[in-house]
Amino acid sequence: MKFVVAAACLLGAAFAIQEDRLVSRKLNKRFIDDAGNYNISFYHINDVHAHLDEFSSSGTDCTKPERGCFGGYARIKTVLKETRPSHPDSLLLNIGDEFQGTMFFSFYGGEKIAETLNQIGFDAMTLGNHEFDRGDDHLGEFLENLTFPIVSANIVSDHAVLNRTIKPFHIFPQYDLAVIGVTTETTPGISSPGKGTKFTDPVAAVQDTIDLIRSTTNITRLAAITHIGYDEDQRLARETTGLHFIMGGHSHTPLGDFEGAVGPYPTIVENKDGDEVFIVTAYRWGEYLGYIDVTYDAQGKVLAYHGAPIHLTNTTAQDEDLQEQIDEWRGPFEEYAKEEVGFTNVVLDQSTCQQKECLLGDFVAE
C-alpha cells in the first residue's frame, strides 16, 4: 500500500482544493479492472447548524468579508452545479444536525432548511441529535417536507410520522449500493425526543442492518452515514464486519491535509475481519464540502479512493438565485435580531465549546 499525491486538482482550483491536499490511494495487491469493480463519487456534509448563509471564522454572520467569509448553501450549490455533471455516478449525502445555530432555525424552525435541502438535491440524510431539539412533532413536519429518504437504523419511534419516514437504510438500485444511517444514542440526554422515541446502540444496529441487507438482497456495496462522532466512527469500524466506508458527523472533526486537521481524510481502521474501513467527515457549519471517489470491488471492499474536502471561501462563487432567496429570508428577522438585550466587552466565542470550557458556555451556565 502506498500514498501518492495527485498530479492535478480533480475539481479545479476554483474550489480551493490544493494539489497537495487531494490524495489518492490504490492497493498494489489488487488489480482494478472492469470485472465487478465500480467507482462512485460521494459528496457529504455534516453539522451545518442552520448556516444557510455564509459566516465568519467564528460562525457568526459575515459582516467583514475582508476577514474571510465561509460556507453557505449558495456556494455549495455552485460547486455541485459545476462538478456533478462530470461525475454522473455520485451521491450527495447529509450527515445531520441541520437544526440549531442561527436565526434561520430560531425564527423559521425547519421550514427554510427543508426548502434549501430540497433545492440542493440531497440523495439521503441521517438525523443528528439537534433535529430533535423541538420535539418529535416539529421534526415530523420537517421530514414530511423533504423530498429524499431519511435513514437511521438505531431510531425506534412510536411517533406516526417518524415511524413512517425514518428507515434503517436506503438502496440506490442504479448503483447497487445501500446507505445505512445511525444517530448518536446520547440524543435523549442532549436533545428533546419524545418518550416513545428510543435510540439503540449504533454498532449493533449497523451490524444487524448489514446482515439483513446481505441476507435478503444481492447488494454488496455499502456505505454508512453516521451522526455519532469521529471516535465512535472508529469504534463502529473496528467492531463490525461487511462495512468498508463511513461518512460521519457530530464531533465537528476536521480531517485532511491542512492546519488544524486532527487526522487524515480518509482515516483508515481495520474491522473485525482485518479489512480496511475508510472514514471521512467534513468539519462543521458547511465550511467544507466533503468529496471522495471510491472504487468498490465485487465483494464491496474499497479498492481505491481519490478526493479531499472542498474549502468554501470567498473565492467560491455563490449561486445567485439561492443567495437571493436566502437574503429575502433574512428580512423578517433582521429587526428582531437587532434588538439589544445586553452588552459584552469581550467576544463570547462559541467555536471551541464542544472541545473545552468556553466563554459563551460559562456565560450561559453561570
Label every model-predicted segment.
Residues 1-19:
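Fungal secretory targeting signals
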Residues 17-313, 360-365:
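Acidic, metal/ion-coordinating pockets
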Residues 292-295, 301-366:
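Hard-cation-handling environments
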